[in-house]
Amino acid sequence: GQMYRISTICIAFMLCTFNSAYSQELTIHPGQLWLDNNGKHINAHGGNIINADGHGDWDGETRSEDGGPMPGVSAYKSDDLVNWTNCGLVLEVLDQPGHTLERGCVIERPKVVYNKKTGKYVMIFHHELKDKGYDAAMAGFAISDTPEGPFRYIRSLRPHAGVWPADWTEVDINAAKALKMEDYKEWWTPEWTEAVKKGLLLNRDFDGGQMSRDMTVYIDDDGKAYHIFSSEDNLTLHIAELTDDFLDYTGKYVRMAPAGHNEAPAVMKRNGKYWMITSGCTGWAPNEARMFWADSILGPWTQAPTPFKGDKVDTSFDSQSTYILELPNGQFIFMADRWQPWQLALSPHIWLPM
């Protein structure tokens, strides 16, 4: 979709940090260039920040400044969440023809999480293969001893080949199995939408595994990790339980908001309730964010009004959610990207207090 340049909304806010030794007041100016220790805009998009030994570690997509193939994922490190040091590429694409990580592939929305059981850092990302557009729709996995990498690439796959959702009955499964793509050639009709809700696309991809595009990873209080991703041609979110090492799926997953067309999920938990912010699907162009809540990460989820207030609600302040950062003082920061398709490397970061 087309994106229009519009004037930046200046929202400056104070930040409490992971490290109590830093008590000076710090201000963030969303939407402006955010310079690292080398004086360059932080080139880590669609990523997340974790608290690693009292400092912030920010991993995200590194886009090429000249519009060429992306080089991979970079990490940045900070003691105050405002001044960031570039640690360089932590997962690099490869100059190996035929390799799934071959230069020209696309890595989007990388999320790095710490696994307390194994002591390893795990990166999960949306992976598209070289010269295949957005057809691959795979989930990629990599592992490291430190959040600053280097990450060792493990594999990419489509989740849940041969597995139906955990909450489906025999009746649900048989209804989905009866749905054939050739009976629904025209998209967006009421009949088609109803068929998607019942599992038309889930059944189509059943043998080879489900599509995995925009995504996040959420670790619950009990240490269980969940991979939450746009599936079924971006029409339905899947919430999938990961194995104890975070490197595979247990096979337990549920669908959320079938045929709802949600992307860019970001999750938080407050006072025992789970909250998810998503965006609609309009390519690189921004749209109004949506919010859902649940008493359990596996649902059921209920849609709530948009969380945004103010002038730019219909485009979520011209941004798309990437992560919700919880600070030690219980404050939450909504992290988002204001995508600039003409120069993705310089896409501004939008941080808003929640």
PLM features: residue spans?
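Carbohydrate-active catalytic/glycan-binding domains of CAZyme proteins
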Residues: Y22-M354
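Bacterial Sec-dependent N-terminal signal peptides
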Residues: G1-Q24
